[in-house]
């Protein structure tokens, strides 16, 4: 995006955030600060309608009908466990897996104090002041009583193995009080705040969207990150690159064909890359007869120089093809990323 346009957007955002209403608590700034908590509570309460606190639920491979989170990755088995440690710590035990497997711990402010890749010891989750039992644990401290353990296990034509391993992902404890307050705002404030958040999405660096503790990232960046991809994680574990336009700056549409070049060297040993496409209208996977929603290190053929060529088109034909069929955007992900990797693809409209 042109630097001048970015500057105009940031000036507009600043002016809107500083605009006050008659109620000092019913402001755009207060709404944006509260937005991550709102979204976490909304997701938690929806999940609790069908699942039990402190118990894991696994999705299997996500398809376009799954609206649990926006911008999900397709070839991953997700595990969810909303819990409360109001009455004492909880312990998560996990199996060994020879491919990518991560355990992310979220609080209700969308802080992620820990993302542990292929854990080698039990994970103990606690609040400040709670006593740690004897044992060798990876200790994680939360800022809120309630939280989420979110697991990602990459699936490479081995769903049966993944499903069997998931039986060994368990929590001891986590069955405290699940009540969590949410601040309410006027419809006018909410509408104006979302104008700001939507404007920020186009200019925020995804590497600066998520933090471990409150204050790690700007509340503006966090709100934009949560709206675009709730349950996203800090950049040392997963790095993100948005694919919103072609190289001429035009939004991506479902009628044209695009050739995407993914750069080499995005991830370190044990990691992988993925490019997933989503409908602009709902931020979910796009239904198609091929049931192909992404390409990854495991499902695409590299070029000799280590780059990857992908074809995004209505039919999904072409090298490493992904079907589109409607207005869309993409997300490039690098798991176990190289810190120096450039998370930007080349997008050529044919």
Description of each model-found segment:
Residues 10-17:
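Bacterial N-terminal signal peptides
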Residues 2-9:
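Bacterial N-terminal signal peptides that target proteins for export
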């Amino acid at each position: 995006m042109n630097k001048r346009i970015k500057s105009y957007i940031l000036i507009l955002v600043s002016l809107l955030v500083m605009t006050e209403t008659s109620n000092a608590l019913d402001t755009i700034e207060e709404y944006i600060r509260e937005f991550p908590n709102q979204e976490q509570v909304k997701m938690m309460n929806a999940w609790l309608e069908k699942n039990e606190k402190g118990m894991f639920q696994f999705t299997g491979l996500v398809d376009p009908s799954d609206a649990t989170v926006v911008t999900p990755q397709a070839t991953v088995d997700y595990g969810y466990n909303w819990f409360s440690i109001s009455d004492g710590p909880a312990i998560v035990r996990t199996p060994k897996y020879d491919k990518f497997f991560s355990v992310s711990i979220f609080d209700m402010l969308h802080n992620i104090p820990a993302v542990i890749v292929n854990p080698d010891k039990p994970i103990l989750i606690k609040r400040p002041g709670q006593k740690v039992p004897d044992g060798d644990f990876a200790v994680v401290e939360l800022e809120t009583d309630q939280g989420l353990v979110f697991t990602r296990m990459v699936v490479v034509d081995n769903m049966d193995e993944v499903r069997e391993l998931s039986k060994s992902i368990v929590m001891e404890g986590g069955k405290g009080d699940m009540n969590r307050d949410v601040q309410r705002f006027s419809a006018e404030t909410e509408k104006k705040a979302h104008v700001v958040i939507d404007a920020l999405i186009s200019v925020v660096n995804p590497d600066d969207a998520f933090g471990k503790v409150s204050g790690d990232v700007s509340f503006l960046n966090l709100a934009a990150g949560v709206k675009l991809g709730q349950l996203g994680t800090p950049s040392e574990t997963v790095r993100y690159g948005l694919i919103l336009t072609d190289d001429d700056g035009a939004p991506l549409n479902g009628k044209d064909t695009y050739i995407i070049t993914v750069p080499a060297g995005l991830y370190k040993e044990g990691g992988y890359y993925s490019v997933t496409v989503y409908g602009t209208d709902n931020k979910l996977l796009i239904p198609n007869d091929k049931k192909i929603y992404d390409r990854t290190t495991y499902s695409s053929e590299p070029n000799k120089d280590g780059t990857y060529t992908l074809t995004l088109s209505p039919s999904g034909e072409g090298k490493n093809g992904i079907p589109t069929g409607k207005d869309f955007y993409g997300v490039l992900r690098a798991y176990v990323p190289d810190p120096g990797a450039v998370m930007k693809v080349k997008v050529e409209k044919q």
